[in-house]
Amino acid sequence: MSIDIDWERATSGPDGELLAERIRSFIHDKFQQIVLPRFIRSVQVTSFNFGTIPPELEIRDLCDPFPDFYEEDDNENFSESSEEQSPTREPVDRYGSKVESWQANSPGSLEDHMQGRMGFNGPLRMPPGEENTGISPLRSPMNFGDINPYLFPRSRTPGIPGGTSNLGYYMPLSGLSGSQTPLGTVARGSPFSGGWPDVHGARPSRRRSEVEPDSAQSRPSTANTGNTLLSRGSMSSGDPRHSHHSQGVPGSDHGQVLEPNMPPTSSDAPLDDLPPRRMREQKAEDFQVFCRTKYAGNISLSLTAEILLDYPMPSFVGLPLKLNITGLTFDAVAVIAYIRRRIHFCFLSPEDADALIGPEIGSGGGEDTLEPNSPRRKPLSLLREIRVESEIGRKENGKQALKNVGKVEKFVLEQVRRIFEEEFVYPSFWTFLV
């Protein structure tokens, strides 16, 4: 079954421009992490455009979602529990008794209520030693189920910058490291969670996990992602398990991004110490679609850089370089899964597509019609063709610039293919909150 897309409506207007800018920024940040050849310096991605030609979509199968899509991480566990699992707590007093409704602006109402609950008519007094200390805000009862978890600050997501988009990708869950222990582990009784010191002996202490649900010390560190948005548990180059770069990026519950979760892994930590994978409950309304995606359009991407000349001395002068990707040809199987207000998206490699859908997927004629086990098929990339134009130097005083520099073009195309396959091809996937 084919699907028609209103491409102009989806890619134009303020929303389309914002999405294009986020994609440009994502690709730019990825290029900043690349080790450049000695003769290239300062790569900048200056523009991105969706073009005017839409992709062709054809639904091939409908099935249950991949198990990786059900895996939770500690960052999204808090929001999940606040949305669906945590019932609203009844207000309680400091002794754990249920508090009846009372008017806060009525003089003496709280004191009268407490006297009635405790069964005496004398004036209400605090226990000895607490008259002047008061109740610590961190120890007072807090209904975290009513707090929007996205109001807490988060670190910048290594894809779409700013942390405000509706895109996210995830990194694979791995081991724990020192103080960067995930919140879920602390709540289960980690030996590192000593709790708050009890300055009031009569009051039971609360652990850090109860009062700092999203602090910098309780969340897994994302510093090693290069501080760059959109995951999947983006398993771009790590353990082939769900992450998630979905973890593009705070706002409302709709259109919210989940940050990537990639805790640092200790090389000497035994595998038995790794936390077990926590899976969401499968529901009957969850579904997954395999969709063949073919594209031969005029999508464009512009980059600038400098080429260094070593004559008469190393890095003697830099020449401006401009690269324009003017279109590409693409043929792959997309996976779209819907699981409780989350849409997970990725592409399948040619080998996985052959195994799940059949060898006819991705065969567009010519060399692509080889048998699945043919050695010539293995290196096949999802990006079949990328058209690029390059220009070195500036046209000044009638002088012509040097165009179509093959060595530089080859390097840029290799990096574009690598970024695409690491960030978009399963087991990497992106998560959208809807």
From Swiss-Prot:
Comp. bias intervals (Acidic residues): 70-83
One Pfam family in the UniProt entry: MMM1
Cellular localization per UniProt: Mitochondrion outer membrane; Endoplasmic reticulum membrane
Listed InterPro entries: Mdm12 (IPR027532), MMM1_dom (IPR019411), SMP_LBD (IPR031468)
Span of domain SMP-LTD: 1-434
Signal peptide (residue range): none
Sequence segments annotated as region (Disordered): 70-141, 181-275
Keyword entries, A-Z: Endoplasmic reticulum, Lipid transport, Lipid-binding, Membrane, Mitochondrion, Mitochondrion outer membrane, Transport
GO BP term (any one): mitochondrial genome maintenance
GO cellular component: endoplasmic reticulum membrane; ERMES complex
Biased segments, Polar residues type: 215-237
Membrane-topology descriptor: Peripheral membrane protein
Chain's role: Component of the ERMES/MDM complex, which serves as a molecular tether to connect the endoplasmic reticulum (ER) and mitochondria. Components of this complex are involved in the control of mitochondrial shape and protein biogenesis, and function in nonvesicular lipid trafficking between the ER and mitochondria. MDM12 is required for the interaction of the ER-resident membrane protein MMM1 and the outer mitochondrial membrane-resident beta-barrel protein MDM10.
Name of the protein described by the UniProt record: Mitochondrial distribution and morphology protein 12
Taxonomic classification: Eukaryota, Fungi, Dikarya, Ascomycota, Pezizomycotina
Name of the gene: MDM12
